[in-house]
Regions:
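Bacterial N-terminal signal peptides that target proteins for export
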Residues: 2-16
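Bacterial N-terminal signal peptides
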Residues: 12-26
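Boundary at the C-terminal end of the N-terminal hydrophobic targeting segment
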Residues: 27-30, 35-38
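Short, aromatic-enriched amphipathic alpha-helices that serve as compact interaction elements
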Residues: 43-59, 69, 73
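Short, solvent-exposed loop/turn elements at domain surfaces
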Residues: 60-61, 80-81, 160-163
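Short solvent-exposed beta->alpha transition segments
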Residues: 63-114
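Exposed beta-sheet edge and beta->alpha loop/turn motif
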Residues: 110-165
Length: 165
């Protein structure tokens, strides 16, 4: 086999490389977050970033796959209030639609006080609108998730009204 031009990959190999690249892209698109779960090595900011990535691709590879990841990082106290995954998913879809399939998210500086952390986030939704949220996390003191940062609550911060001068 001769390359069609100096330095180019022979034609049969170009097709093979293209197919391999497309297959790799399909795997990444199908599961952009991977298997994310609480771990003591994850910082509060890393936990929020993982949850935001899951929300940005909420229905990949299957419906609510991203919400299952977010629920996996919900603290035991949060889970007791929000119920099983199905109820949690409905609550997020109804109460936080701007977070689903959002375009971008930028983290503010983290505020920590011992085993409690507040992580501000500015998010641009799929329609291009800006939203601000605060994630409250706590470091779990015992049990299955000992020393893991997990989300206790998320609330939207209303825009400040403009002051006329």
């Amino acid at each position: 086999m001769r390359p069609s031009a100096p330095g180019l990959i022979p034609r049969p190999f170009r097709l093979l490389l293209l197919l391999l690249a497309l297959a790799a892209g399909s795997v990444l698109a199908a599961d952009p977050v991977g298997r994310a779960e609480p771990h003591p090595a994850l910082s509060p900011a890393a936990v929020v970033q993982l949850q935001l990535a899951a929300l940005a691709f909420v229905d990949r590879p299957t419906r609510d796959a991203g919400l299952a990841i977010v629920w996996g990082f919900a603290s035991p106290g949060n889970r007791s209030l929000t119920g099983p995954l199905k109820r949690f998913a409905a609550m997020i879809r109804d109460g936080y639609p701007a977070m689903l399939n959002h375009r971008t998210a930028v983290l503010a500086p983290l505020v920590m006080d011992g085993a409690v952390a507040l992580q501000g986030v500015e998010l641009i939704d799929r329609e291009g609108r800006r939203h601000r949220y605060v994630f409250q996390l706590s470091k779990q003191p015992d049990g299955e998730f000992r020393d893991c940062w997990m989300t206790d609550s998320v609330f939207e911060v209303p825009d400040e009204p403009e002051v006329a001068t």
